[in-house]
Amino acid sequence: MSFSLRIASRSAGGLGGRVLNRLSKLVSVRVATRPIAALFAAGLISWGSTADRVGSDGSALWSQLTVVGGPSVAVAENWPQWRGAKLDGISGEKNLPVKWSKTENVAWRLALPGPAGATPAVWGERIFLTSVTPEGQLVAMCVSTAGKELWRKTIAEGNKDVRGDEGNSASPSPVTDGEHVWVLMGNGQLACFTVDGQEVWKFNLQERYGKLNIAFGLTASPLLDGGRLYLQLIHGEGNPATREACVVALDKLTGKELWKRDRDSDAKAECEHSYASPVLYRDGKVEYLLTHGADFVIAHSLEDGRELWRCGELNPKSNYNPTLRFVASPVAVPGLIVVPSAKNGPVFGVKPDAKGDITAVAEAFAWKRPLNTPDVPSPLVHEGLVYLCRENGNLIVMDAKTGEQIYEKRTVADRHRASPVYADGKIYLTARKGIVTVVKAGREFEILASNELGESISASPAISNGRIYIRSFDALYAIGK
């Protein structure tokens, strides 16, 4: 008897010894009583013939192992940053719970010091979060997958709530590579810790790049890829003569700037501000960073940040809305980039081989949808379908190739701030009042469950270890066994 197991290697070169030496840090593999190296030596595990690069880490590889015979093997995927390993909201985890409540199918609940909109990052047996405290401290936390707090570090003082309960200074999501964790706060404080809680470096973005002029605070999460940390700082004071937006790449281990590029636009007023996060496009042939805001989505070279292409008319100049700030981020899958806008504006399906200014280049688009963008939740693409969760709870499903609408149905009539995630044939949609609607993936609309926790939620779910981790304003829940 044999079956395949896919594990992650952080080496783009030889896949042998380095994977074995660091396997426990990269993926949770449990093999009955025998060390994995011994299984290789015994011929019970062998490297498969294929290996393909996936994930947001540019050096990460999925390599196929073939496991022969008896041992019981289980693999848990990591969720290292906002929207998961590939920044697309997709998890390969199976046998996840469909129904739960505050008491049913909850492995544990850990009370947290205060609210946050940041999605947890999960690696192995550690979960990383941010929070504010009642005293206004901005803290980073590490929690075990058993639900025990391992450490807590104060990053800065002085929380700032925005728009009532819509956000605070703990909105950007942490990122981790299993050895370090990087935490960004709404006041610009950026810090790197070891996973054991030892500070490596810390500085404030505003001291390096100038005051952040953004109405509702910094919410863009950092993006980790290989040895680099990417940040989009899209903001401004509404003065076209002083454009302040920039994109930067930092060395993840030192915080040293590797490159910085000004991000030009002609956006006006509040449109200069962006609350979206950067994403990557990578398909084995081309790769680049995508930044979203100030009326444009722009692709940048990973090496030096130079602009490769841009797309405008997301805020049409013929009917310009000076309050149209982007919150939802694009989602990129091989062959397609789905670009949202804001406030019932358009959604574009962009072909990834774009070059230059594609705004008026018809052949650069797979399709265009003139209305019904999600205002806050980011799109999801899976198996040829595009899922748009609108802020009112409506779910729109479209054909990814043509943009044709398949259906639009109501889930929960409430604000939706979290982005949808997919796992095990299901789409998980999180309403602000604490209800998670589980919808069957596919062309037919079917609600499988409506699960109420009774606590406010803005963070997107994280999926790992056979569980769904949900960060409410009050607590962290581990949903599952």
Spans of model-derived segments:
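Noncatalytic, solvent-exposed loop/strand surfaces
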Residues: 61-481
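Bacterial N-terminal signal peptides
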Residues: 32-47, 64-70
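N-terminal secretory signal peptides that target proteins for export/translocation
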Residues: 1-31, 51, 56-57
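Hydrophobic alpha-helical context, especially transmembrane and signal-peptide helices
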Residues: 4-8, 39, 60, 75, ...
